[in-house]
Amino acid sequence: MEITFQKVEHRYQYKTPFERRALYDVDVSFPSGGYYAIIGHTGSGKSTMIQHLNGLLQPTNGTVQIGEHLISAGKKEKKLKPLRKKVGVVFQFPEHQLFEETVEKDICFGPTNFGVSVDEARQKARKAIELVGLEPELLTRSPFELSGGQMRRVAIAGVLAMEPEVLVLDEPTAGLDPKGQNELMEMFYKLHKEKGLTVILVTHNMEDAAQYAEQIVVMHKGTVFLQGSAEEVFSHADELEKIGVDLPMSLKYKRAIEEKFGISIPKATLSLEDLTHEVVQVLRKGGHESCSS
């Protein structure tokens, strides 16, 4: 299910003295089946942008085409329920939205709300909890008896139980320890590969953006600043830093090595393994030349 923004503008508190423009002139497409990252400094428009993906926000100007659904400025989309089934959104700290007395009831809430029978919802809950790497035995437990990481997985299972075609992740690993962050990101990538899910990840973690995303969209002051593969985007390191976007650690180490040893590493290395390989190659070629990047 392809998603396309055309000349999208969004203003909060439109036509009031408190009006504030959060998005403008946003032109971007997310073809079906891809893995995308949206990055940018705090306040760049990332969260506003993703709230247009399932009709939580409507553009002030422009259009958002989500599969067969067209959301236009000034026109109310009447069939948002089917859209919200197809586009699942995992907001920051989704565990704060848990409220039922058992894990099973919490996961079943979404499917039953969309008209699925109780028995079918239970089947979906069992599949979903296994997808997020939890034991089915937890279905009878209170979600509030679980660890923070388990609670987050339960909340994500509630989104997956609706079997969305698009999974939107807003800082999904915020507040987790490094091990929990890595496990969750690997889980999302596995779902993307095995289920063919389109994944749109909003993140401040540049390592995650570089490692997982096929395409990266850089937002700045409410519009698209850069778009391309990780290699293309992070080759603009100086420009990214000027707009407050962090760089992957491998690029920071690359700069430090170039400055320390007076060598030039031409390739934009996006992992420490790549960086090690490139340094070895340069040194083998006698690369002690003045640093040019």
Swiss-Prot record:
It is found in: Cell membrane. GO terms for molecular function: ATP binding; ATP hydrolysis activity; ATPase-coupled transmembrane transporter activity. Its EC number is 7.-.-.-. Residues 3-246 form the ABC transporter domain. The keyword Cell membrane applies. The keyword Cell membrane applies. ATP binds at residues 40-47. Gene3D superfamilies: P-loop containing nucleotide triphosphate hydrolases. One of its GO terms (cellular component) is ATP-binding cassette (ABC) transporter complex. Keywords: ATP-binding, Cell membrane, Membrane, Nucleotide-binding, Translocase, Transport. CDD domains: ABC_cobalt_CbiO_domain1 (cd03225). It is a peripheral membrane protein. It is an enzyme of class 7 (translocase). SUPFAM superfamilies: P-loop containing nucleoside triphosphate hydrolases (SSF52540). Belongs to the ABC transporter superfamily. Energy-coupling factor EcfA family. Forms a stable energy-coupling factor (ECF) transporter complex composed of 2 membrane-embedded substrate-binding proteins (S component), 2 ATP-binding proteins (A component) and 2 transmembrane proteins (T component). ATP-binding (A) component of a common energy-coupling factor (ECF) ABC-transporter complex. Unlike classic ABC transporters this ECF transporter provides the energy necessary to transport a number of different substrates. This is Energy-coupling factor transporter ATP-binding protein EcfA2. It comes from Bacillus cereus (strain ATCC 14579 / DSM 31 / CCUG 7414 / JCM 2152 / NBRC 15305 / NCIMB 9373 / NCTC 2599 / NRRL B-3711).
